[in-house]
Amino acid sequence: MTLVLSFALVGCNVFPFLQNNPAQQATQSSITTGEIEAIHEPKFGGSYLDITIEEFNNLGFEYGDSVDVTFSNGYKLSDIPYYNGYYTKTNEPLVVAYPGYPYIDVCINNGEPLWETAGLKAGDTATVTLHEKQKYATVQKALDATYTNNRSDYASDEVFANFRPMKGGNLAEGVVYRSASPIDNQNNRAPYAADLAQRCGVQFILDLADTNEEIQGYYQNADYDITWHQSLYDVGNVAALNLNANYRGGQYAYRLVAGLREIILHKGPYLIHCTEGKDRTGFVCALLEALCGASYDEMRDDYMITYDNYYGINEKDDKARYDAVVDVKFDDIARCIAGVPTYGSLDGADYAAGARKYLTDVGMTEWEINKLVERLTNK
């Protein structure tokens, strides 16, 4: 299976038998949730639907189906995919049953908050109806990936915690690390990430995921030793940015710049993390690598270590899925950094210049950027 094939098939009549069988069509049309409550998901701005993943699937929906979502205020999303992960490209809508989520989520992947875009308010409802059976099955199968939260399933603490030093371009060795969260233990990785960071001498943490209130909540409910993390937090060496997933949005960039200014003011080594150390961390680390002169290959290789750590997806053992992730996930990050349109070519892209422009566009000065680069490169 090639990358082009996997995505080209989505728009073709891959399953003609579904359209030619009246009995099957009748069965499909009966698959619906009926009206269910829409719930604001404030972190990323999507809309939870008041139905669990298990309940939703028991109605007859399957990953890879095409569905229609109609909200009670009249806003409608037609012919969108239902996946168990964020497998659409940036700014494309989907219904997602992300492992560990309490409910089904309707959102715009890495885009503007659907709740606001759709004009939703408390008390609104949504109805999900099957549009076409398994229309998006090719993408679902290519990108389907889940992970466990059991340390014994992974080769090392570093793999389990998705912990590693950042590399590429002129980045200095041992100055910046990245990982899963060392404080939010919902995925059982926090103790391992914290221990590894402490052993590497981390002095400042850029927390992309949390608010200060959420960090305080983790302290109050911690089931492991949080002394090291709290010692940094208490002296102002943890910056909580509470980023959403829309790295093309102004709010994301403004908050990120505020955090990068904190790096300028504090000595390293530094740790950058979100919850999994995958999406928000993936973008921010690629941006900083680009700023320090990293090539496309260096940024991609670092980004894709995460998919090997969590899912065993790597170029050697699973090239088709590796290429699919690069196409859907990393290449959009590369385009954003380079200032290339969403579906534009990356040929000849200047990532260092693009990274600078990304930051100056939201008010970071050239002097500040140069100081940041000095911190990251020890030059």
Predicted regions and their residues:
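Active-site cradle of extracellular carbohydrate-active enzymes
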Residues: L271, T275
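Long, compositionally biased stretches
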Residues: N21-N110, L114-T129
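Hydrophobic core
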Residues: L3-L9
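Cys-dependent protein tyrosine phosphatase-like superfamily
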Residues: F15-Q25, N110-E112, E116-Y270, V284-K379
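Ser/Thr-glycine-rich phosphate-binding loops at phosphate-binding pockets of nucleotides
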Residues: E276, R280-T281
